[in-house]
């Protein structure tokens, strides 16, 4: 029944197998794609119009060398250097091993918050520690009365059955339970970090490795809050939301973009001595930075390759921003659409290198400073102010029907005349404006009853100014992308 339901998103194929007796060759596959998200009536109409399989306009498909039957990859893609590679013997990629996946907490609602205080994370840690003491005592009692089942596996099973699973007190995961079975107490001394959880939506993070399921390599990208860096984030393989890239100056969440992979400008490493660290920081004098060295993440192999083509003045920072410009190029993402879904991005060598670097830097500066306030009148936007109250009540809403030129910010403020083209800047399947409207809403987690209020992040006009700013960023991003020079692979 669901095959013909309106707008069904489940991929369905009707297969007709024809057996020909005495055939002297292998079989063929003929294919016809009728389109996506059709209504029930449209699907039935197509079948009715064709009447017979003989009337269908079939396309014979032959697998590529990559084994692709449909959505075949571009064979030119493999001629380019990959952005990164975890294989130590593959040193010809742009970043080699110097990249990370986005941070994955497995308990976002407990660790991430718009509020500056991490009261929920601390409350969970305190509950964890109390549970550990209680279970340890029960285990000791068990050992005194039982002579079998006293090993580590028995203890793990015992703790599994005994621990509290109250969803409003704790969020268990495999990693946290492993700490529990090892009887590791967790202290509440942690640093607060900024994380971009979704496009253009920052949250406060209680940065404690024991309660972050997959912290990845972020300590080598941002060792502490006073260490600066910028990081290009790209969609991981398998995305059905289209390929995207975004840049931040903070930690990135695993779902900032789909299964995010993150490529920093710098990599930090612990120094052998304070003297060597100071020399390696190009005379940086920030706080405790003397205990770390900083180097560019782009490899020497790639630098040598680019200098051989574009000249000796090219540096690793130029290459970093060149990469960001290429990843924003519509021609690149369209030419290698299927490759970007299935493989790590590979970056071509293009003509007009200096222009790509210039626009890559401009795009990065725009996206890194997306919170900078903008005058709504300069964008031709009308703001109807019935009361100067900038609190988001529940959530923002678009106009009636499909009208996105209007946003009801709250009961007292309405924003009108939002340019239609502002919605054409798409990040991870949605416009940047839609991400703001969706993410900056008051939410209550059903399992934990934790309330997350975006008004607590910066207060005042922050969310209002952010919304206006993102409209401007969306328009300027498209202007800069339109300035990209001719896409010509060398």
Language model feature labels by segment:
Residues 1-490:
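Sequence-level detector for compositionally biased, low-complexity segments
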């Amino acid at each position: 029944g669901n095959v013909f339901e309106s707008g069904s998103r489940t991929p369905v194929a009707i297969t007709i197998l024809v057996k020909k007796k005495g055939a002297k060759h292998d079989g063929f596959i003929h294919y016809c794609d009728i389109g996506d998200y059709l209504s029930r009536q449209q699907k039935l109409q197509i079948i009715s119009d064709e009447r017979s399989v003989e009337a269908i306009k079939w396309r014979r498909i032959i697998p590529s060398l990559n084994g692709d039957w449909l959505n075949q990859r571009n064979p030119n893609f493999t001629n380019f250097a990959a952005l990164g590679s975890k294989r130590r013997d593959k040193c010809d990629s742009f970043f080699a091993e110097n990249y990370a996946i986005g941070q994955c907490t497995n308990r976002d609602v407990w660790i991430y918050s718009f509020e500056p205080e991490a009261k929920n994370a601390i409350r969970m840690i305190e509950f964890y520690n109390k549970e550990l003491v209680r279970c340890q005592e029960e285990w000791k009692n068990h050992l005194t009365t039982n002579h079998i089942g006293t090993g580590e596996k028995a203890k793990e099973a015992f703790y599994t059955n005994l621990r509290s699973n109250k969803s409003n007190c704790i969020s268990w995961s495999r990693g946290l339970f492993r700490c529990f079975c090892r009887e590791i107490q967790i202290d509440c001394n942690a640093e607060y970090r900024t994380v971009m959880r979704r496009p253009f939506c920052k949250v406060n993070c209680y940065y404690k490795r024991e309660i972050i399921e997959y912290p990845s390599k972020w300590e080598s990208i941002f060792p502490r809050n006073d260490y600066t860096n910028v990081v290009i984030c790209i969609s991981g393989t398998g995305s059905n939301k289209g390929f995207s890239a975004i840049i931040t100056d903070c930690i990135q969440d695993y779902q900032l973009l789909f299964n995010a992979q993150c490529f920093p400008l710098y990599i930090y490493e612990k120094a052998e001595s304070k003297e060597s660290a100071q020399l390696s920081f190009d005379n940086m004098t920030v706080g405790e930075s003397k205990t770390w060295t900083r180097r560019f993440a782009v490899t020497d192999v790639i630098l040598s390759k680019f200098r051989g083509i574009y000249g000796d003045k090219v540096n690793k920072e130029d290459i970093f921003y060149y990469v960001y410009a290429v990843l924003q190029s519509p021609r690149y993402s369209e030419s290698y659409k299927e490759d970007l879904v299935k493989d790590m991005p590979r970056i071509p060598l293009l003509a007009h290198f200096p222009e790509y670097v210039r626009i890559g830097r401009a795009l990065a500066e725009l996206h890194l400073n997306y919170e900078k306030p903008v005058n709504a009148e300069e964008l031709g936007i009308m703001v109807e102010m019935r009361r100067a109250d900038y609190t988001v009540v529940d959530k923002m809403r678009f106009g009636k029907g499909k009208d996105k030129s209007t946003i009801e910010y709250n009961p007292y403020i309405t924003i009108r005349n939002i340019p239609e083209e502002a919605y054409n800047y798409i990040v991870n399947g949605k416009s940047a404006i839609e991400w703001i409207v969706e993410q900056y809403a008051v939410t209550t987690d059903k399992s934990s009853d934790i309330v997350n209020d975006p008004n607590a992040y910066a207060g005042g006009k922050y969310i209002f100014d952010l919304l206006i700013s993102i409209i401007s960023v969306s328009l300027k991003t498209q202007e800069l992308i339109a300035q990209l020079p001719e896409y010509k692979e060398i």
